[in-house]
Amino acid sequence: MFSPSVYSEIIATLPPSVRLVAVTKTKAIADIEAAYGAGIRDFAESRIQEALPKIEALANYQDINWHFIGRLQSNKARKVVENFTYIHSVDNLAIAVKLDRIAEELNKFPQGLLQIKLLPDENKSGWTREELKLDLPQLELLKNLKICGLMTILPLGLSPGDRQLTFGELKNLATAINQQSSLSLTELSMGMSGDYPEAIAAGATMIRLGTILFGDRL
């Protein structure tokens, strides 16, 4: 259940440059409506089959921005482009090219964030720094998928200090890419319920909050 009091406490401390994205996977439409009523306009889902009924039911809320944060499957790419403004989990060149091609067919311009794997983690997908450097020339050629930033998820078990340092590496990487390529990366999607303060301190522009706002997953 959405907690207006927790949301109020969090939003009171957020810098104006940070956007709160409410993660509503497994949550009911009523929870999203409650969060909307409190002022949230950015909502994230990770499974297309779960997201579509919610997006359809809330179609009258025309100022909602839908964010896709789940693992991108090639056969679900079209539905993602059709329904989401932001795609946080662009994690390899092949899926980026496919999203761009579909977006061109649909005359859409979704905002894409490149998922970066800053530390070794076999459970996470994404580019390493070395892989991204190799793929940058091809990413610069994308026309309809607008690469607007980077996203990362940290492995569990890091200290607060190490989390902030690692998040800072994502900001440094974005700065380097902006200097070395034609991309203009302005968004840093980093920080979740357990580590968002460190992400904000390191320069996050989007934080993805679920459990802290809605309680544990069902």
Swiss-Prot record:
Residue numbers bearing the N6-(pyridoxal phosphate)lysine modification: 25
Functional description taken from the UniProt entry: Pyridoxal 5'-phosphate (PLP)-binding protein, which is involved in PLP homeostasis.
UniProt-listed PROSITE patterns: UPF0001 (PS01211)
Keywords associated with the record: Pyridoxal phosphate
Family: Belongs to the pyridoxal phosphate-binding protein YggS/PROSC family.
The name this protein goes by in its record: Pyridoxal phosphate homeostasis protein
Classification via CDD domains: PLPDE_III_YBL036c_like
Source taxon at top rank: Bacteria
Organism encoding this protein: Synechocystis sp. (strain ATCC 27184 / PCC 6803 / Kazusa)
